[in-house]
Amino acid sequence: MSLRHDFDRECRRLAPLFAAAQNADRDLHAAWKEGVSLFGGHHHYKQTEQYQKTLDRFNESRQVIDQIIGTALSEAKAGKVNLATLFAYTALPGRYYRSGYQRASIWRFLKHLTLEAEQVQILRGIVLDQITRAGPEFVEICRAARNIDSAELRESVRKLLLQPQKPYVLDRAKRMLDLLEHTSV
């Protein structure tokens, strides 16, 4: 099996788990807002049954995917490098509470690896996609991008600059391009 096939399979496997964590996170935030308005900003809402159920559901759904990713990262650090799961997690759209921190730790790990050609190709696609939607982990993505720099990647980032984009996307693309051009010199 190719890494591309494994990556696609992992994306399909993780997507519903990630979506469940996102939905539970959204519900928890809604319960929090409702509780704050009901109790006038006091923290008594945390004792309500609805809030506790929502919190439990969020923790359970997040724990499932966090455990999969934690295990994959631990195994990768131990030398059993199957990066499909880690690549898939970084590629999934959206976020939930603390998912950005987990993604940042994955990117920190990836920047130290010597990658094969197929791994580099997949990671370049993820990096380009994350320019438009990453959260606080974008700094780590930029650092990892130096490891997979190529003329092709820089050209793809330049193309992003020529397309109509939101201002933050343009800023990120400029930042990424500056970093890659200074690294390649």
Region locations from a protein language model:
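Extended repeat-based scaffolds of very large eukaryotic assembly and lipid-transport proteins
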Residues: 1-140
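Extended alpha-helical scaffolding segments
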Residues: 102, 107-185
